[in-house]
């Protein structure tokens, strides 16, 4: 994988060069000497393939644009179709790697709309039928192909990844049931008194109501109740009536097996009061007016397992079944308790609180399992439960109705995974030691510490020459465009000049790409890092290259426009400056030996928080470096 990412880094530079060949740029080499891209390419991270896909998409669309600009009569030829289809393939690849590809789609889409608008106004050469043909071709290539490719990647994903793993807890029970060893046998549909059941939480990735022979260290110090994400015998509960059943002779039948001896099962209905007996530890689900050990809110009560073998229980063991009809699947499941189909709440009879769980982890004394409380409030999804496993001696055989999870199919799994991905990304809101906000990215105010060991450090930081020159190019273009617009309003005929018009379009499209890949991050509250700026940096570098070419082609000051020697010298000087910066900062990219003095010498900004004290005092203290030793395996 590391070799693959390194190859991606080289390939993205090659594609970037090919993209800029069209305006005959002389400064593309700065992309080859970008320390931040190099650092990412050396680690197993998504950003290197993302940059390859972004560069390929930009190259393909630029090539298609060149075909398009040859005129309507050149449309629909083989090369026209090739580059249009390659653009669609690039968009599909980009968005399949990271959702940042949606910004690339927006960039291509906006420029495509401009093309269609211009064609619509060309009534002399473009008939309505021909325009519709252009529209349909672009819709197929730039919408159908990317969407199809994106969905195909998930189809391959589902075919290859058929075993459960650490991440399957994020998915619904229906999704998990399609994984190997996660499926279950058909179980009895109706739930009766005496059923041995496992109860799952609807929200928070569906953990099981669980208990184990460990006590709370505070509060009542009774046995813990938690939410546990895996199947386990400690998830099994026996559903008892609030009173013991009566036999045929009218006498009370005692014991936890009493309901097995009835002539026929008694189904549990909406409003019935039950007790939940934990069969492995002989205790019952219990709640009382005691604060929980972690969430010590007044509206939360502790939930515990209380009692011992042979103990008849007390009133605090009683819970009422409250079926939530709008969440239950079938008409029958709205009236009585049904496996999987019925969604219900467990209301504590004595206090009126509702069995509740949320994404709060208990400490190590509870194996960091999820907290379960009894809440007088809280959101409905966090108090919803359903029965997954259901066993009863009188509900066996082929004549008993059975149920199982429905197979969600490809589209159901695909859509659920999109929602989980969105929710997981949006949930990354906690502060991180190395995060940064978008306002700091264009000026390279802060990097990311990836790894440090043995007086060496890998710290993601871009080449300042590349970053600051590309940011300057964006600022210069904005000022240039503002002045050009004012001159155009005063009837100055700048756009009659072909060179002026051409470079305005080329620089403008690059700056537009930068804007699409940069400004949306201001709307995000999640954790953000410097590497999120890389796609925008790609377009900013393209803007700088075009700006450099435009300046050398248009500026007559000092004979620059007519003197190729000056042009070459300026290009070589910039290249030399870029190389010097690359070499100076390369120890941070490669994790090479370094000294404190060398580190402090290149620390231009105080906000660059790589630790110079981690390096040796002088060269004589640097021992032989073992490549790859202790290298990081984590990403951001």
Regions found by a protein language model. Name each.
Residues 22-24, 66-68, 78, 83, ...:
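Transmembrane helical bundles and short interhelical boundary loops of multi-pass, membrane-embedded
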Residues 433-436, 448-506:
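Membrane-interface anchor segments at the N-terminal boundary of transmembrane helices
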Residues 105-115, 535-538:
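Hydrophobic transmembrane alpha-helices of multi-pass, membrane-embedded glycosylation machinery
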Residues 49-76, 90, 104, 115, ...:
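Specific aromatic-rich, kink-prone transmembrane helix
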Residues 158-416:
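Lectin-like carbohydrate-binding module/patch detector with strong preference for beta-trefoil
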Residues 1-35, 51, 71-82:
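Transmembrane-helix signature of polytopic, membrane-embedded enzymes
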Residues 14, 41, 75-78, 82-98:
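Membrane-interface alpha helices of multi-pass inner-membrane proteins
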Residues 39-50, 97-100:
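Short acidic/glycine- and proline-prone juxtamembrane loop motifs at membrane-interface regions
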């Amino acid at each position: 994988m590391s070799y693959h990412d390194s190859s991606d880094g080289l390939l993205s530079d090659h594609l970037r060069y090919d993209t800029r060949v069209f305006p005959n740029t002389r400064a593309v080499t700065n992309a080859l000497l970008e320390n931040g891209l190099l650092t990412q390419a050396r680690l197993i991270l998504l950003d290197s393939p993302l940059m390859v896909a972004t560069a390929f998409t930009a190259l393909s669309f630029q090539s298609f644009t060149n075909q398009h600009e040859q005129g309507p009569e050149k449309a629909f030829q083989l090369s026209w179709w090739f580059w249009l289809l390659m653009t669609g393939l690039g968009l599909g690849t980009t968005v399949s790697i990271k959702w940042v590809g949606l910004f690339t789609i927006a960039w291509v889409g906006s420029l495509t709309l401009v093309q269609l608008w211009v064609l619509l106004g060309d009534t002399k050469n473009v008939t309505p039928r021909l325009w519709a043909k252009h529209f349909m071709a672009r819709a197929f290539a730039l919408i159908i192909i990317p969407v199809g490719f994106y969905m195909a990647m998930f189809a391959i994903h589902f075919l290859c990844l058929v075993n459960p793993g650490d991440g399957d807890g994020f998915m619904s029970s229906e999704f998990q049931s399609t994984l190997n060893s996660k499926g279950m046998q058909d179980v009895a549909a109706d739930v009766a008194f005496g059923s041995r059941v496992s109860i799952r939480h609807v929200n928070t990735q569906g953990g099981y109501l669980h208990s184990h022979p460990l006590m709370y260290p505070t509060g009542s110090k009774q046995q813990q109740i938690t939410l546990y994400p895996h199947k386990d015998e400690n998830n099994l509960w026996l559903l008892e009536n609030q009173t013991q059943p009566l036999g045929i002779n009218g006498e009370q039948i005692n014991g936890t097996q009493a309901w097995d001896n009835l002539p026929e099962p008694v189904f549990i209905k909406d409003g019935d009061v039950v007790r939940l007996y934990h069969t492995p530890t002989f205790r019952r689900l219990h709640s009382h007016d005691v604060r929980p050990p972690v969430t010590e809110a007044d509206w939360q009560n502790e939930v515990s397992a209380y009692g011992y073998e042979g103990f008849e229980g007390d009133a605090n063991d009683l819970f009422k079944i409250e079926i939530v009809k709008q969440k239950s699947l079938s008409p029958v499941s709205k009236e009585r308790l049904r496996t999987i189909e019925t969604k219900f709440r467990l209301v504590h009879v004595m206090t009126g609180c509702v069995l509740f769980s949320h994404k709060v982890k208990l400490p190590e004394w509870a194996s960091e399992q999820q907290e379960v409380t009894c809440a007088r409030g809280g959101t409905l999804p966090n108090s919803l439960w359903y029965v997954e496993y259901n066993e009863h001696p009188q509900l066996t055989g082929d004549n008993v109705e059975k149920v199982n999870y429905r197979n969600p199919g490809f589209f159901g799994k695909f859509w659920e995974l999109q929602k989980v991905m969105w929710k997981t990304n949006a949930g990354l809101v906690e502060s991180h030691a190395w995060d940064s906000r978008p306002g700091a990215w264009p000026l390279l105010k802060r990097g990311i510490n990836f790894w440090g060991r043995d007086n060496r450090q890998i710290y993601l930081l871009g080449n300042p020459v590349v970053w600051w020159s590309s940011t300057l190019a964006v600022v210069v273009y904005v000022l240039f465009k503002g002045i050009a617009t004012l001159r155009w309003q005063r009837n100055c005929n700048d756009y009659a000049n072909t060179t002026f018009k051409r470079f305005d379009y080329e620089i403008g499209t690059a700056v537009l790409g930068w804007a699409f890949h940069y400004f949306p991050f201001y709307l995000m509250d999640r954790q953000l890092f410097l590497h999120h700026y890389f796609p925008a940096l790609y377009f900013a570098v393209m803007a700088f290259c075009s700006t450099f070419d435009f300046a050398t082609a248009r500026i007559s000051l000092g004979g620059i426009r007519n003197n190729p020697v000056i042009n070459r010298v300026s290009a070589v000087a910039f290249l030399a400056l870029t190389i010097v910066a690359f070499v100076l900062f390369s120890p941070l990219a490669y994790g090479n030996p370094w000294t404190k003095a060398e580190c402090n010498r290149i620390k231009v900004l105080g906000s660059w928080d790589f630790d110079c004290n981690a390096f040796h005092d002088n060269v004589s203290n640097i021992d032989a470096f073992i490549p790859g030793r202790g290298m990081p395996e984590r990403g951001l």
